[in-house]
Amino acid sequence: SLRVWIDAQLAEVGIEFDGGRVQILCMPRVLGHTFNPISVWFCYGPDEALRAVMYEVHNTFGDRHSYLVPLSENDAQSRVLHHDAVKQLYVSPFMTVTGGYSFRLEPAGEAYSLLIRYEGEEGDRLIATHHAKRSALNWRTLLHAFVKAPMIPLKVVMEIHWEALHLFSRKRAAFFH
C-alpha cells in the first residue's frame, strides 16, 4: 500500500513518523489515464506538525525519483519552505542530469503554491509553478472538475511533448536517456 511505502521512505532517512497523517497532492486518474510530473507528499506527526515533505518527480518514460526532506521544528512552523536538491532523474531530452532543483513551497491552509527552479551550468534552465485551492472532496466537486477539464492528465503529457517538439525544431541539443 502507499502507506507502507511512505512509512518505509521516512524510516530509511531516520524520520520518526509514529503513524501520523499523510497527504499527497497529485493529478487524478481520469478515464484510466494519469501522469504526475510531480507529486508532493506532506507527512505529519501525531501532533499534526509537518515532519517531512517529499517531492516525487516522474518523467514520461515511467521513471521516478523522490526528494525527501525532513523538517526541523523551525521549518514546520514556517509558512514558506525552501529546499534544494541535486538533480537525480532524467526528465527531458533537452536537459542533462546535472544541476539541481530549488523548491519554494507554501503548503499551509486553503491555498497551496509550489515553485520549482531547475538550475544548470548556465543558470536557470526551467521555472515551473503550481498553485491550487483546497476544495471539498465530494461527487459535486469531482463532477465539476471533470466537466471543466476532463482530460487534464492527457493535456499535461501533450503539452510536454509539444514543448519537446518545439525545442527539437529549434535544433536544441538533445540528450538521450
Language model regions located:
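Mature, function-bearing regions of proteins
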Residues: 1-177
